[in-house]
Design a protein with these regions (language model features):
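OB-fold single-stranded nucleic acid-binding module
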Residues: 423-430, 521, 526-555
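A common structural junction motif
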Residues: 402-407, 433-440
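Beta-strand elements of well-folded, non-transmembrane domains
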Residues: 454-456, 471, 517, 536-538, ...
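Accessory interdomain/linker segments of ATP-dependent helicases and helicase-like nucleic-acid enzymes
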Residues: 445, 452-513
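Beta-strand/loop nucleic-acid-binding surfaces
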Residues: 508-524
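Hydrophobic helix-and-loop "lid/oligomerization" segment in the mid-to-C-terminal part
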Residues: 6-129, 148-150, 168, 202-426, ...
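Active-site cavity-forming subdomains of large catalytic enzyme subunits
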Residues: 120-190, 194-203, 213, 230
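Short acidic/polar mixed-charge low-complexity motifs
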Residues: 380, 507-510, 544
Length: 555
């Protein structure tokens, strides 16, 4: 069967457009039956949680803690995945009959992960059992100290082990453990927590339906942590997105009522651009505690105050982010002049460490080079956040250089580390060496990839509504990008902030288009007909919905 025949068969069987069927084929669909995985949101795709190594051990540990009424603490991370995972554990274990205390790390006071100070605080409070979420898989020394304090330790993580041995916890749940048969290696930490609780409820006879109210938190984490959209992640995220509108959780109700652009549907863009930044803002500006309190709050007056505080944090975050970005550009020129290396390492005194990761991502995108943004603290310790560009692997680059870090961790595309300020120049040299080992070369004139060539007449509101069937869009399920040829440009206007607005015209079809931060395209657009690369989005203005093209580039 040719692709043309397959797209026709998919369109006919599932009553969708040929264009949507073509997108499904690009997603790897090779038969009409495979298309059901994408189009039927109710098609189950969950793996048996008991396939996860050490699941029985973990259940026995918390069951014994409940039986003996032990004091249990949940300790997470300061990003949304750690916050959501902590909320799921605190809420669902409490529902199960095991009340827990919780604590989160603070970027500005102790940094990432478990610390000696934190352990001492929990010991002084009488902690007997510690559950780590979104952290712990590399915390060998810290868990050793917890065990010496007499605590039992359960680790729920989704990061890869360091390769230097596992911590001596009582039980570790992590899909990346050696010999772990759990098929989905792409779970976020909140997803690991959910699977653990699913197994716990199943084993102890508590209704599994009681867990469904926590699924929106799994959706938030899966999208915010940018984990690959595997089949199970797709299923769990969709279930969670569908629960926003009828949740009995006050926080989810508020997020839905105030931040969902379409009250009939919570989409991935609502989470990516509205909900996740709001919930991450408290940890970036002060303490993540505000976000966790918000997610767990059951008092209507208190939750309003918490939401207002989160909104204030988010406003502050935007301003600080813009300020640091401008300073980073200036500092870049001071360090390197016009001769940029393959890896950018940009340091400055006491930048806000909560937003350096956002700035690093923006710089990496702008300069097409992996970038580490480093905030040098008054005590001489420098705190860094790094983001990748192209094929550069941060984890592979940092691992051979771990001798110069006070602490470090990360993935292929992102990393963080603490380093003594006097070693920053050495870091610059060694990162260039690692770029050479990896064969990384910045591609300054990157071609803009697109999925399909279309005519503008195919891009209408019916298609955009139909496109929601492929939600949620994220890692390994990206929002489709289109190419339309011979587009006439009409009514071009330059806007403040370096944006361009115009009408894209092809035949009898005219659609509003905007190019964000792309004033450099103005000359190309003024020349006449262009081949336009874009995303097609829905825009609602004064209650009227219309199609808007978000321009990625011109050919």
């Amino acid at each position: 069967m040719t692709n043309a025949q397959l797209s026709l068969e998919i369109a006919k069987r599932y009553k969708v457009s040929i264009l949507l069927a073509r997108i499904l084929i690009l997603r790897g669909v090779r038969s009409p039956e495979e298309a059901e995985h994408w189009l039927n949101w109710d098609l189950p795709c969950e793996h048996d949680p008991f396939l996860m190594k050490n699941m029985d051990k973990a259940i026995k540990l918390v069951s014994a803690a409940r039986e003996s009424k032990k004091k249990v603490w949940v300790y997470g991370d300061y990003d949304l995945d750690g916050i959501s995972g902590s909320a799921i554990l605190a809420g669902a274990l409490g529902d199960w009959g095991l009340p827990v205390n919780w604590m989160l790390p603070n970027r500005f006071d102790g940094g990432y992960g478990l610390s000696a100070v934190t352990l001492q605080k929990m010991k002084d409070s009488g902690a007997e059992c510690l559950i780590l979420i979104d952290t712990g898989i590399t915390a060998t020394e810290e868990i050793k100290a917890a065990k010496e304090f007499g605590m039992q330790v359960l680790v729920l993580d989704h990061h890869k082990p360091s390769g230097e041995g596992l911590p001596n916890a009582d039980a570790i749940l992590d899909p990346f453990l050696e010999d772990c048969e759990y098929p989905n290696k792409s779970l976020c930490a909140a997803g690991v927590a959910y699977k653990f609780l699913y197994a716990l409820y199943q084993k102890t006879g508590k209704p599994l339906s009681d867990l469904e109210k926590y699924l929106p938190l799994v959706s938030l984490s899966t999208l915010a942590d940018i984990v690959p959209m595997s089949a199970e992640n797709l299923y769990l995220t969709r279930k969670g997105m569908g629960k926003f509108s009828d949740s009995d959780c006050l926080a989810i109700q508020i997020l839905y009522e105030r931040l969902a652009s379409d009250k009939n549907f919570v989409g991935s863009s609502d989470i990516h651009y509205r909900m996740a930044p709001l919930l991450n803002a408290s940890g970036r500006m002060e303490s993540p505690d505000t976000s966790l309190k918000f997610l767990l709050c059951k008092d209507k007056e208190e939750i309003e105050a918490l939401y207002e505080k989160l909104t204030e944090y988010n406003t502050q975050r935007r301003k600080v982010e813009l300020d640091i970005y401008a300073q980073a550009i200036k500092r870049l020129k001071e360090i390197y002049g016009s001769n940029l290396p393959r890896v950018l390492v940009i340091d400055f005194l006491e930048w806000n460490i909560g937003v350096v990761g956002i700035v690093a991502a923006r710089m990496a995108q702008e300069y097409k080079r992996p970038t580490a943004i480093i905030s040098v603290q008054s005590d001489g310790i420098a705190v860094a956040s790094a983001r990748s560009a192209g094929s550069f692997n941060w984890h592979a680059a940092l691992f051979p250089c771990r001798d110069i870090f006070i602490r470090w961790g990360g993935h292929v595309k992102a990393a963080g580390f603490n380093i003594a300020a006097e070693k920053i120049n050495e870091l610059r040299i060694r990162m260039e060496e690692q770029a050479n080992i990896q064969g990384f070369v910045p591609v300054l004139e990157e071609s803009i990839n697109y999925d399909l060539e279309v005519s503008l007449s195919e891009i209408n509101l019916n298609f955009l509504h139909e496109l929601k069937k492929l939600e949620p869009f994220g890692n390994e399920n990206s929002y489709p990008v289109f190419l339309a040829r011979q587009i006439a440009v009409r009514g071009l206007r330059l806007l403040n902030g370096g944006h361009i607005r115009f009408y894209a015209v092809q035949g009898r079809t005219s659609i509003s288009a905007i190019a964000f931060n792309k004033s450099y395209l103005a000359d190309s657009l003024k020349k006449g007909d262009v081949d336009l690369i874009f995303e097609a989005r829905s825009n609602v203005y004064q209650g009227v919905e219309s199609v808007q093209l978000i321009v990625a580039g011109v050919v």
